[in-house]
């Protein structure tokens, strides 16, 4: 089984400092949906791992988060792909939960669900917390320069062996070719 972990905001869709609070605000980054379809055609199981603290902050509710994810699922399917699962942390940063990236709880849940360790599994993100959570589990951290990725790269201090690509489409081209 080929598994790949993708952050959502800034990797699949455009991010916003004001959060993605409705399905209308969810807009895919050009090439990302087709990239997910290519992964599926290459027999990858695509798993989204995303912090969604807007729920914990009261900016939107679970119904709205599910509607956003439903829109994403439909858009990916329309492009010929499939997201196997979405794991998310709904807690605000001050909740001190174990599932919020950069902590490893969400990644541990994914490993348990798929009955595997994540050693070497590609984990694509645009923030240091995405890359740190991946590295803690032995996954391969991959930074994309979309979303907050360029700022993350400029700030430095990336986990050892982090790969850097312009966007998800470039990551997928590297993986499947």
Language-model segments: which ranges?
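Conserved Lys-Pro-Asp/Glu-containing loop-to-beta segment of HAD-superfamily phosphomonoesterases
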Residues: 98-131
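Acidic, Mg2+-coordinating phosphoryl-transfer loop and its flanking beta/alpha structural elements
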Residues: 123-166
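Structural recognition of alpha->loop->beta junctions
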Residues: 69-85, 154-176
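Short acidic, glycine/proline-rich loop/turn micro-motifs
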Residues: 16-20, 58-59, 154-155
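Short phosphate-binding/catalytic loops that engage adenosine nucleotides
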Residues: 44, 81, 139
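Active-site neighborhood of HAD-like aspartate-dependent phosphohydrolases
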Residues: 1-47
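Short, electropositive alpha-helical surface patch
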Residues: 58-73, 98-110
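Substrate-recognition element of Asp-dependent hydrolases with the DxDx(T/V) motif
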Residues: 32, 36-69, 84-95, 134
């Amino acid at each position: 089984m080929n598994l790949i972990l993708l952050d959502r905001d800034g990797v699949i869709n455009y991010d916003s400092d004001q959060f993605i609070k409705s399905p209308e605000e969810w807009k895919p980054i050009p090439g990302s949906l087709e990239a997910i379809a290519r992964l599926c055609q290459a027999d990858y199981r695509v798993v989204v791992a995303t912090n969604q603290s807007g729920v914990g902050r009261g900016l939107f509710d679970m119904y709205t988060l599910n509607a956003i994810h439903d829109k994403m699922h439909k858009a990916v399917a329309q492009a010929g792909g499939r997201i196997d699962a979405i794991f998310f942390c709904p807690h605000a940063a001050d909740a001190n939960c174990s599932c919020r990236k950069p902590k490893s709880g969400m990644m541990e849940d994914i490993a348990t669900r798929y009955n595997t360790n994540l050693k070497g599994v590609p984990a694509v993100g645009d923030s240091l917390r995405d890359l740190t959570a991946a590295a803690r589990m032995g996954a391969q951290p991959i930074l994309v320069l979309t979303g907050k990725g360029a700022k993350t790269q400029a700030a430095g201090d990336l986990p050892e062996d982090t790969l850097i690509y312009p966007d998800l489409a470039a990551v997928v081209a590297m993986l499947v070719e």
